[in-house]
């Protein structure tokens, strides 16, 4: 029967004449040596030119990859061998290798050797580890040596093809050939070895239009392939498939069956003469070089023929050889030590050879039989001894749940059902079948519909209008996955509805299937474990589907094909195209728990949870989180990071705080501060911001709360952390100009310090100016111009700074009035709206202030802040206070003061008598009448608690020491409301109205 292979073109790259092609064993690269002297590297998956080398000005007839060295080796008509690094594109080495054109290059698979042949009739071997010294020369041909091929089964021997009409076989270390194969009537252009172990064959192609296959042990020609109309320029045994590939100057590439020598396919891409063919080991990819470009093809499918039964016995086919491996040979200790994705150390046993080339292997449900299907035939073997049980013609073979029943697709429209290896039923379809699938029902697939038939009666159960590629049934026969090109459907099968059906339409029984869900995933291979569907995707992921959710088991770097699941080991087993068996941990208890949760059977879920190991519970917690059960996920999760995220999402700030303390991560503290702010937990938010060293957030919190102690602490901490901008701004908000100047000086910002002092602290201008001059002079020592000398000191050059003396007095005046205590109930305008000089003039005129000989202001009869009050920095502006000094104009009168107790009344009157009458501006009444303000309240922080503790310390003392006056003005229990800040007016911040608790 013919070998049925799909041929898919991956790349067609037009170029100058291609004399040699090669395929990279790892990358998806095609190497093409051109007649114009260039070498191109194409990515045949993306169809893009990756790299290009300008080798020489004459034809490059040979080029090969050396992957272990990242090299490309070329041979050209200038008799030189050149070596390039294909990553850097640099030329590593070049030397003259022959005295005539180079025809062929091969790279030894294990040794550091490159072998070249030439028109000088010589074959030479070069050692790149020994500075490319010639290791050996082989002489014996009497004409051009066209090609070399190393024996893949014995790397010490190689064959050469020559225009002297012979093929010679050589051995390293000997200068004479082992033997010569003669039979072609004209020059031999190409030669290759058979890669399988069962046939000692060599293939050759010649100018006599013939292809000959030789037995190099018997030294005889076993077959001649006649079909080409011109010279045969290239031949190849495919290393994976039972194919012989030949190319000719008649523009065709012919595919022959390697066992029957039957011509399978002829390819012609219209690119003129064929010059070279290369097949990739371990894959189904071939490359072809033509006169007008190069082509890359993919033959058949790369999925290996492999099957595993329920006991862990694995059978696979390598070419026509059947081999067996058993998972039970791995000890318990070895199994526990195996990591996910690690190759299993299995011992392989040869069972024998199949009469056909198996493209698929499949065990029966009880594992007793295994079927090999391929070449249009099937053979049923016993799984233990590989004895032939049944055979026949068939394009496809599937098993029923009953191990004694199976179905064979004999043609595109006919399916035969056999029972006990005897004909049972036959189904003649009115549609063109693309495939069949087994299971509880027999499924027939066409390009636009899917039909399910009963095995016993061959009666249609249900027709579904859907395009499907594969069908997977659960073990209990209730669930089925119908997989298409880019999605799959999960259906529930009701055997009871089918048995009790009273009406059968032309589309079968309507209630036979119920759609459970659809998922946009391209399934490559899959199987069921209970109600969980395990599958691999086109994106090389291993996932499982349970209850409408997809969970990823692993991401892999290559395509994997699932074999099955072993409950005892709790592992999913898969194989790659090179037949390496790997596994991944997947606990059955986890699947049972997730299934129970999806069914909302929480009692069962709680029972199963106790059987799940702790190291697997975090995966369960992620599943619960996706399902919306965050509280349960928090209780189950073992990952501190995951628990922190869940506690923040749930608003459980206490748990989140404890977890953040354990890790002490800035990211966690920032996240917790955001959550605490949303919950109006400002104390906690402040502590978190402090631990996270988020000085910007602390400043926002301190200014919103009006906390002077917090601002002072923030200024100190940020300065220690060298966050100078925050420290400067904090001191500026506190009105501590001296601290601001010190920060500017310490950071070398002397010009800025001088200008700030000129505006706010004239008394410090001279000292800062001296520092500025010294720094400027130091920078200009090598210059003829002294920059520092151009800076004028206002003290020495008062004529250049009119009013400087008055500004000194104003500064002293402001420093004195800032010491007057300010009630929290008074609202005052900002400093920008005040005229300090005017206030000073009025105070001097009224005699409320006088100046000493050194210019220091002295206030008369003005109360002073106590020692406790002086610990807090002064406010940026002064509030109204009974004093002979003219106070800044308030926006409104203070809130009504609580009536004093009788025993305090006399003392209060005595205090009032000692004070002068307060000057109230005329515009105050109108402002009070409207009750509006353009500036925020300024609150003297006396009893406000420090919100943020020092970094790394224990929880803060939430109530700071208060003075006697503070105790009278505020209640002992501080509340975040307008009662602390005076009456609420338009523009006031009413924290009770924020309702932050509802924002989460």
Swiss-Prot record:
Q: What does this protein do?
A: The coatomer is a cytosolic protein complex that binds to dilysine motifs and reversibly associates with Golgi non-clathrin-coated vesicles, which further mediate biosynthetic protein transport from the ER, via the Golgi up to the trans Golgi network. Coatomer complex is required for budding from Golgi membranes, and is essential for the retrograde Golgi-to-ER transport of dilysine-tagged proteins.
Entry-linked Pfam families? B-prop_COPA_B_2nd, TPR_COPA_B, WD40
- Annotated region Disordered: the residues are 863-1000
Keywords, comma-separated and alphabetical: Cytoplasm, Cytoplasmic vesicle, ER-Golgi transport, Golgi apparatus, Membrane, Protein transport, Repeat, Transport, WD repeat
Low complexity composition bias: residue spans: 960-969
Q: Which Gene3D superfamilies match?
A: 1.25.40.470, YVTN repeat-like/Quinoprotein amine dehydrogenase
The similarity comment for this entry is: Belongs to the WD repeat COPB2 family.
Give GO cellular component annotations, separated by semicolons: COPI vesicle coat; Golgi membrane
The record's GO molecular-function terms, alphabetically, read: structural molecule activity
User: Could you confirm whether the keyword Protein transport appears in this record?
Assistant: yes
Q: Where in the cell is it found?
A: Cytoplasm; Golgi apparatus membrane; Cytoplasmic vesicle, COPI-coated vesicle membrane
Tell me the InterPro entries matching this sequence.
Beta-prop_COPA/B_2nd, Coatomer_complex_subunit, COPB2, G-protein_beta_WD-40_rep, TPR_COPA_B, WD40/YVTN_repeat-like_dom_sf, WD40_repeat_dom_sf, WD40_rpt
Topology within the bilayer: Peripheral membrane protein
Assembly and partners are described as: Oligomeric complex that consists of at least the alpha, beta, beta', gamma, delta, epsilon and zeta subunits.
Q: What is the consequence of disrupting this locus?
A: Embryonic death and abnormal oocytes.
Q: Where are the WD repeats?
A: 13-52, 55-94, 97-136, 140-180, 183-224, 227-266, 351-391
Q: What is this protein called?
A: Probable coatomer subunit beta'
Q: Which GO terms describe its biological process?
A: embryo development ending in birth or egg hatching; endoplasmic reticulum to Golgi vesicle-mediated transport; intra-Golgi vesicle-mediated transport; intracellular protein transport; oocyte development; retrograde vesicle-mediated transport, Golgi to endoplasmic reticulum
What ranges does the record list as Acidic residues composition bias? 901-915, 970-1000
